[in-house]
Amino acid sequence: MPDSFSKIPIPVILGATGSGKTATAIALAELLDAEIVSADSRQIYKELDIGTAKPTAEERRAVKHHFIDELEVTEPYNAAQFATDAATRIEAIFSTGKNVVVAGGSTLYLQGLLQGFSKLPENSPEVREKLYADLAEHGATALYEKLKAADPEHAATLDPTKTQRLIRSLEILEVSSKTVSELKAAEILKPGFHFVPFGLALPRERLYEKINLRTDEMFKNGFLEEATRLFEKYAPVMRQGVKINALATVGYNELFSFLEGKLSLDEAKNLVKQHTRNYAKRQLTFFRNKFSADWINFAETDENALETAKQILMKLKKANPFC
């Protein structure tokens, strides 16, 4: 990578789901003549549109987005792959003379890109199959306690009910005989860019109100129909034990339970809102603990994306004059 690329400031728009990241990133990208690198672990998948609040076709025509609609639902992908691929993509964008704006809320994607990542072992289908059998027989709590005994530091960062990361952590332990914490303490692979994080802050009550309103809007725009298409397409293979991580997502989880007859539609809708609010709370906790971001009070700009983008640009120019 040319040394000059490492000196170009790259604004990173952080924030909880529903906080206004997409609109702010687009406004900032238009001001900077930039392309957007999306750090969202679900928007990268095709077919997951309404449920992931993917930028609209019009928004993507206005500003080029990367890592949107690039993978099939069944393709596995992780934070280390994203960090590596995003670094390559950023270098390619800089080579065209454009600037870059990073935007997203996927905590591990952002951490890997901004702070580097440890080299973790490849997936082992045999070990994963055994662990999923253990999960079915003993339940998530038993597996979480097993991880907690071996790696309490890493276990404390996990939600015990989210089995995807739990299984992966135990898989790493069995494959490498080392814990995730031990591997993370080893050599960190860091992209050599100058990232400048900005966070979008809203009063919690307002954020939760926006999440509830956005969820209602998603259902008006056809979220149930989208989930039904995905359920009809992928449920048969999932019933055979095939794990599709992309569909283990807030919104789709609850609607799949409705389609299986386990919940009423109203119950599913309310759970989507509740689980999205819970996720937003975890995102904010992670961002504040892990990143030294300049937090912008989104309410002070009346939640106006352009005004917020101008404020970010002013701060960016003051600290890093480049445009």
Curated annotation (Swiss-Prot):
Q: Which GO terms describe its biological process?
A: tRNA modification
Cofactor annotation: Mg(2+)
UniProt keyword annotation of Lyase present? no
Q: Which UniProt keywords apply?
A: ATP-binding, Magnesium, Nucleotide-binding, Transferase, tRNA processing
Q: Which reaction does it catalyse?
A: adenosine(37) in tRNA + dimethylallyl diphosphate = N(6)-dimethylallyladenosine(37) in tRNA + diphosphate
User: Per its record, what are the GO molecular function terms?
Assistant: ATP binding; tRNA dimethylallyltransferase activity
PANTHER family this protein is in? TRNA DIMETHYLALLYLTRANSFERASE (PTHR11088:SF60)
What's the stated role of this polypeptide?
Catalyzes the transfer of a dimethylallyl group onto the adenine at position 37 in tRNAs that read codons beginning with uridine, leading to the formation of N6-(dimethylallyl)adenosine (i(6)A).
Q: What is this protein called?
A: tRNA dimethylallyltransferase
